[in-house]
Amino acid sequence: MANWYRPNYPEVRSRVLGLPEKVRACLFDLDGVLTDTASLHTKAWKAMFDAYLAERAERTGEKFVPFDPAADYHTYVDGKKREDGVRSFLSSRAIEIPDGSPDDPGAAETVYGLGNRKNDMLHKLLRDDGAQVFDGSRRYLEAVTAAGLGVAVVSSSANTRDVLATTGLDRFVQQRVDGVTLREEHIAGKPAPDSFLRAAELLGVTPDAAAVFEDALSGVAAGRAGNFAVVVGINRTGRAAQAAQLRRHGADVVVTDLAELL
């Protein structure tokens, strides 16, 4: 089990879950935490941005600098709503385009258009490759469910419902706050804590009785900003630098797999 480095936590309620006694609900991000779809998102973001940047370079004469699937993904788009990810990355390249509207086609040179182009690419990857569940995450969900804790999935992806259904994870989940929810209820995306706060509200618990599980820097920052009982950072890369970044952004503990908490 992972070592907690905060000395003032109450007695751990169960060696099975590795959580403080006061925790009554678990709020999980989806991509990279429960499912191995983060790699598909990375591929889709890179394919979309590289195509757009190449088109733009040919049109304007600017130098083509491709999207970095490691540095750019984690810094600018991971864990954010699609439109926020598009704005964040383009801003890093000093590129400004109109927002457009949510129903813009993928060919439109707008924030929403590029976001929809990325989503189309993601759907193709999901059809071709499918979404895989991390074995350790499935085992942890089973243990959380057996312990009687509430479970919510909190994701910026608008595809969350479909992924949960196709992977069978929906049987563990009582509440879902995703990209569709954020749009319909006008909830701010991560790193704002609003989506996690909404999930806790739906489960009927206060933030100090809920644990947040995140692999994205924006996600752990959201968990810390919401004053949740504990924020668990998942470092699938295994790199010390990424673990340090997760802690710096608000993770109380960092693991490479949820099974380490069992």
Curated annotation (Swiss-Prot):
The modification 4-aspartylphosphate is found at D29. The active site is at D29, D31. It catalyses: beta-D-glucose 1-phosphate = beta-D-glucose 6-phosphate. Beta-D-glucose 6-phosphate binds at D31, G79, R82, S157, N159. It is an enzyme of class 5 (isomerase). It comes from the Bacteria. Transmembrane segments: none annotated. Coiled coil: none annotated. Its cofactor is Mg(2+). Its EC number is 5.4.2.6. InterPro entries: B-phosphoglucomutase_hydrolase, Beta-PGM-like, HAD-like_sf, HAD-SF_hydro_IA, HAD_sf, PGP-like_dom2. Gene3D superfamilies: HAD superfamily/HAD-like, Putative phosphatase, domain 2. Mg(2+) binds at D29, D31, D215. Keywords: Carbohydrate metabolism, Isomerase, Magnesium, Metal-binding, Phosphoprotein. It holds the Pfam family Hydrolase. Autophosphorylated. Changing D29 to A/E/N: Loss of activity. Binds 1 magnesium ion per subunit. Shows comparable activity in the presence of Mg(2+), Mn(2+), Co(2+) and Ni(2+). Also shows 60% activity in the presence of Fe(2+). Is not active in the presence of Ca(2+), Ba(2+), Zn(2+) and Cd(2+). GO terms for molecular function: isomerase activity; metal ion binding. Catalyzes the interconversion of D-glucose 1-phosphate (G1P) and D-glucose 6-phosphate (G6P), forming beta-D-glucose 1,6-(bis)phosphate (beta-G16P) as an intermediate. Does not show phosphatase and pyrophosphatase activity. Is probably one of the key enzymes involved in the metabolism of trehalose, a disaccharide abundantly present in mycobacteria and which plays a crucial role in bacterial physiology and virulence. Belongs to the HAD-like hydrolase superfamily. CbbY/CbbZ/Gph/YieH family. Monomer. This is Beta-phosphoglucomutase. It comes from Mycobacterium tuberculosis (strain ATCC 25618 / H37Rv).
